[in-house]
């Protein structure tokens, strides 16, 4: 079983990448996607609408069965959303802890699954959001970032969390926002933390068009160049055998790194 965790700053596009990777894998593999973000929107484009979260289900039934928490979407992809508390109430990562405990109790990870993908909020790699790594639910990690300051800042913090948890970083994914020298910036960042750029996803209007219909690009525009990018990324990650324990930059190193590109630009 291939067990992949995708981390990144909130709003960076993790869910889009995860859902399209899952759709790409579904043609040849049995896939489970677990959304570990309080927004609970990872699987919307796979299932066609928002799912009830594990926390929502548990409010109604303390002993749910598998069919209440796992829903089958596009290509047979099995979808789960951990959920989170109402804004301002409780720990945002609590849903991940509760969801993982329930899924394990229900024997989900013993089923006939080839690929598990976790979509994890990574502004802070602590508490519940560290569960996929800390509790050994995921074998490899990928960081999604753009070339923007705050996204890279979060990515560096994620690298710090991965190192602390002794996780295996498989690479950095550039989800492009269209800024100057973006792929070069992210590639250099990946190198600085002892990793590599494993893929770059260009900005495309097809993403928004697909998401307006609650579908992935793979489903809505299967012959598009954008769909090909997602398929290649999925394949490169599936075949990846190069992993490192990252070496995050300290604050001064990070500021110098980012300033270098702004000065050169």
Curated annotation (Swiss-Prot):
Coiled-coil region(s): none
Cofactor binding annotation: Binds 1 [4Fe-4S] cluster per dimer.
PROSITE patterns assigned to the protein according to its UniProt record, in alphabetical order: NIFH_FRXC_1, NIFH_FRXC_2, NIFH_FRXC_3
Record-linked CDD domains: NifH
Family stated for the protein in its record: Belongs to the NifH/BchL/ChlL family.
Residues noted as binding ATP in the record, renumbered to the chain: 8-15
Xref: Gene3D superfamilies: P-loop containing nucleotide triphosphate hydrolases
Cofactor(s), by name: [4Fe-4S] cluster
Gene name for this UniProt entry: nifH2
GO BP annotation list: nitrogen fixation
Protein name (record): Nitrogenase iron protein 2
Described function: The key enzymatic reactions in nitrogen fixation are catalyzed by the nitrogenase complex, which has 2 components: the iron protein and the molybdenum-iron protein.
Keywords: 4Fe-4S, ADP-ribosylation, ATP-binding, Iron, Iron-sulfur, Metal-binding, Nitrogen fixation, Nucleotide-binding, Oxidoreductase
UniProt source species: Methanothermobacter thermautotrophicus (strain ATCC 29096 / DSM 1053 / JCM 10044 / NBRC 100330 / Delta H) (Methanobacterium thermoautotrophicum)
Reaction(s) catalysed by this chain's protein: N2 + 8 reduced [2Fe-2S]-[ferredoxin] + 16 ATP + 16 H2O = H2 + 8 oxidized [2Fe-2S]-[ferredoxin] + 2 NH4(+) + 16 ADP + 16 phosphate + 6 H(+)
Pfam families per the UniProt record, alphabetical: Fer4_NifH
EC category: oxidoreductase
Binding site for [4Fe-4S] cluster: 91, 126
Subunit structure: Homodimer.
Database matches in NCBIfam families: F430_CfbC, nifH, PRK13231.1
Entry superkingdom: Archaea
ADP-ribosylarginine, modified sites: 94
EC number: 1.18.6.1
């Amino acid at each position: 079983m291939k067990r992949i965790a995708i981390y990144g700053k909130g709003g960076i596009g993790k869910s889009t990448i995860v859902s399209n990777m899952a759709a790409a894998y579904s043609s040849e593999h049995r896939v489970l996607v677990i959304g570990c973000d309080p927004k609970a929107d990872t699987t919307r484009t796979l299932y066609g609408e928002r799912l009830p979260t594990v926390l929502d289900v548990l409010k109604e039934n303390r002993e749910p069965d598998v069919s209440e928490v796992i829903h089958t979407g596009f290509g047979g992809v099995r979808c789960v959303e951990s959920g989170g508390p109402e804004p301002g109430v409780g720990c945002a990562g609590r849903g991940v802890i509760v969801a993982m405990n329930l899924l394990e109790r229900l024997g989900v990870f013993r089923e006939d699954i080839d690929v598990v993908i976790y979509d994890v909020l990574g502004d802070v790699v602590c508490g519940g959001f560290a569960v996929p790594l800390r509790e050994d639910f995921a074998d490899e990690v990928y960081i999604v970032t753009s070339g923007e300051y705050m996204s890279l800042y979060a990515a560096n913090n994620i690298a710090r969390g991965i190192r602390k948890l002794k996780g295996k970083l498989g690479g950095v994914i550039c989800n492009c926002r269209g800024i100057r020298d973006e792929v070069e910036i992210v590639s250099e960042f990946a190198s600085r933390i002892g990793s590599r750029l494993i893929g770059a996803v260009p900005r495309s209007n097809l993403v928004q068009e697909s998401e307006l219909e609650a579908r992935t690009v793979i489903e809505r525009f299967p012959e598009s160049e954008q769909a090909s990018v997602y398929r290649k990324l999925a394949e490169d990650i599936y075949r990846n055998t190069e992993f490192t324990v990252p070496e995050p930059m300290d604050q001064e190193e990070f500021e110098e790194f980012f300033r270098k590109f702004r000065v050169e630009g």
